[in-house]
Amino acid sequence: MKKSIFSKKLLVSFGSLVTLAAIPLIAISCGQTNTDQSQQPGSGSTTGGQSGTTTGTDSTTGGQTGSESGTTTGGQTGTTTGGQSDSTSTSKEQGSSDSTSTSKEQGSSDSTSTSKEQGSSDSTSTSKEQGSSDSTSTSKEQGSSDSTSTSKEQGSSDSTSTSNMNTR
């Protein structure tokens, strides 16, 4: 008797979780990802397959443009309300601009990667931290500029490229 009650509660909890997870996916597929409908004014421009609503001053045409102000709402719903634009991704945080990735944090701009943190810009890499920029592309950002490397920390600059800009 106890087991059936527990399994019913588990089933109800799982059903609620699936329902909550399905709502933002439906919203993303309909193109209305900002659930509270209160967009902040800004000049964000997005390109190509966009599911996140951008309201900051970032543009997705070449990495981060330096704006890291704003907040994100909705966890993995793709709803963003400040300084972020992303394409085909799920969980983004403030100030990031990325393509085909999953978990991003403030100030990162990357492509085909998984875990990024504040101030990093990288392409085809895995673990970055604040202020580092690891890239095999031409777009560099604040802090440091690294090319074709994997793990960088704040303020470091390892590069085999000719373009190195330290903005901080």
UniProtKB/Swiss-Prot annotation:
Residue spans crossing the bilayer: none
Ranges for the Sequence repeats: 81-92, 93-104, 105-116, 117-128, 129-140, 141-152, 153-164
UniProt feature, compositional bias: Gly residues: 72-81
Residue stretches of biased makeup (Low complexity): 35-44, 52-71, 82-168
Xref: InterPro entries: VlpA-F-like_signal
Lipidation (N-palmitoyl cysteine): 30
Topological type in the membrane: Lipid-anchor
GO cellular component terms listed in the entry, alphabetical order: plasma membrane
Chain spans, region 7 X 12 AA tandem repeats: 81-164
Signal peptide: 1-29
Subcellular location: Cell membrane
Record keywords, A-Z: Cell membrane, Lipoprotein, Membrane, Palmitate, Repeat, Signal
Region (Disordered): 33-168
Chain residues carrying a lipid of type S-diacylglycerol cysteine: 30
Stated role: Responsible for the antigenic diversity for host adaptation. Expression in E.coli of a construct containing vlpD, vlpE, and vlpF yields antigenically distinguishable products corresponding to each gene.
Other remarks on this protein: The numbers of repeats can vary and is one of the basis of the antigenic diversity.
Name this protein carries in UniProt: Variant surface antigen D
Biological classification of the source: Bacteria, Bacillati, Mycoplasmatota, Mycoplasmoidales, Metamycoplasmataceae
